[in-house]
Amino acid sequence: MSILYEERLDGALPDVDRTSVLMALREHVPGLEILHTDEEIIPYECDGLSAYRTRPLLVVLPKQMEQVTAILAVCHRLRVPVVTRGAGTGLSGGALPLEKGVLLVMARFKEILDINPVGRRARVQPDRKSVV
């Protein structure tokens, strides 16, 4: 049982083979950094709420939006759930991974895309930190 996913209520997740998902991502998403060993994955088993921990099947760290699109396409085709994570600093458990899922880490997306000082708005990528 996971704090975020209860099979009795949400339905069973399909059983997936780590190696099959790893090979499909390597084949369809060139240049993607994929973490798959326990040593690599352990730091991603929780966010800032460290009371709850779940190791994901794989952790992927894309550098380009095209890679994100390809990751989601592969995971959809293989019926593998995806949890998206920024810097992992949240304290609500919103980025806790699923044991049978891929953790999509968006920490490399830090750009400011647009600033509208008149409208007091900014459009930024997911891991852009505010500077006051």
Write out the residue ranges for each language-model feature.
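Noncatalytic alpha-helical scaffold of FAD-dependent oxidoreductases
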Residues: 1-85, 90-132
